[in-house]
Amino acid sequence: MRVESLLLALQCLLGFVHYSGALSTCSPLDLELIKRKRIEAIRGQILSKLRLSKEPEVDEEKESQNIPAELISVYNSTVELNEEQAAPPEQPKEDPVEEEYYAKEVHKFTIKLMEKNPDKFLWFNITDISQTLGLNRIISQVELRLLITTFPDGSEQRLELYQVIGNKSRYLESRFIPNQRKWLSFDVTQTLKDWLQRSEAEQGFQLKMADNCDPQKTFQLKIPGLVLVRGDTETLAVNMPRPHILVMSLPLDGNNSSKSRRKRQTETDQVCTDKSDGCCVRSLYIDFRKDLGWKWIHEPSGYYANYCTGSCSFVWTSENKYSQVLALYKHHNPGASAQPCRVPQVLNPLPIFYYVGRQHKVEQLSNMIVKTCKCC
């Protein structure tokens, strides 16, 4: 039976060789055409993700005004978080579930300033967070961010994060302390969701040094913003890199996520060269002003969207009994088009800072930067 199936498949493919010869219209790949189509696709994609029917009109007077420091801080923090969380190409997510299509609005909430803070508490105004987010939003991601500026010498140590519950605290997770000035991030998505279901006006975290031998070990880290330094002005307080949470959320009606099918895939993070004909990632920089004619996006000025190109000459796995037939078909019909590589595997998000009329906004656009491609 196995031999008969193999012969039947072989006959079908060899028959297709003669048929495809008459229909073959292979032509050199027009990279400029692909770029133009990719740019136009991105134009529509960004507007769609932001739920805009057309590009916003630029308010020249508003554009020339000073941008609020708070929004610049939100944008910069989002960029830093994305850089830290970017998946290395050599460790792609296997069988990923697609992120929500629509843009996620980003909000930044800093801790309550305290004159003294010996127990290293991080208090947040939950009432303010709830009112800012509103009721009809889905919280997608929440990250607690701390800047470590002074670190202990000697052996490697850990910083532990606890959730404050009344007079007690519950352990959440820990991070190894870097030996350099660096931001630390903790995923506190579920914690904030729980807080928003309660009635308390304030909720908080506590930081502790991990030490099994000495639980009361002195806190040796310096984290700016844990206490209010005497003499701080309002401007300095705003610009101080205080501990904060970044909340990414989207409206209830924008949660149109779909799960990807599980299947075997061949993936590549290979960057295309002039001689590349196999599946690869081709670099494409989009300048918002030059390529799209947009002045309403303040930051960034552009980004590397990239795209997948090339062909997948061998897409069946060695486990498939018909792989020999495919190889034989390619041998007899070398001019036939191989399966195109047009499917991104790993895509990174893009935060943008833009104007809508007289309003400034910071939002995160999911799946905008192609990092790796796959043959499927």
Swiss-Prot record:
Keywords: Cleavage on pair of basic residues, Disulfide bond, Extracellular matrix, Glycoprotein, Growth factor, Mitogen, Secreted, Signal. GO terms for biological process: positive regulation of cell division; positive regulation of microglia differentiation; regulation of cell population proliferation; transforming growth factor beta receptor signaling pathway. Residues 23-68 are annotated as: Straightjacket domain. CDD domains: TGF_beta_TGFB1 (cd19384). Residues 1-22 form the signal peptide. Disulfide bonds join 272-280, 308-373, 312-375. Transforming growth factor beta-1 proprotein: The precursor proprotein is cleaved in the Golgi apparatus to form Transforming growth factor beta-1 (TGF-beta-1) and Latency-associated peptide (LAP) chains, which remain non-covalently linked, rendering TGF-beta-1 inactive. Residues 69-258 are annotated as: Arm domain. InterPro entries: Cystine-knot_cytokine (IPR029034), TGF-b_C (IPR001839), TGF-b_propeptide (IPR001111), TGF-beta (IPR016319), TGF-beta-rel (IPR015615), TGFb1 (IPR003939), TGFb_CS (IPR017948). The keyword Disulfide bond applies. Transforming growth factor beta-1 proprotein: Precursor of the Latency-associated peptide (LAP) and Transforming growth factor beta-1 (TGF-beta-1) chains, which constitute the regulatory and active subunit of TGF-beta-1, respectively. Latency-associated peptide: Homodimer; disulfide-linked. Latency-associated peptide: Interacts with Transforming growth factor beta-1 (TGF-beta-1) chain; interaction is non-covalent and maintains (TGF-beta-1) in a latent state; each Latency-associated peptide (LAP) monomer interacts with TGF-beta-1 in the other monomer. Transforming growth factor beta-1: Homodimer; disulfide-linked. Transforming growth factor beta-1: Interacts with TGF-beta receptors (tgfbr1 and tgfbr2), leading to signal transduction. Interacts with EFEMP2. This is Transforming growth factor beta-1 proprotein. It comes from Cyprinus carpio.
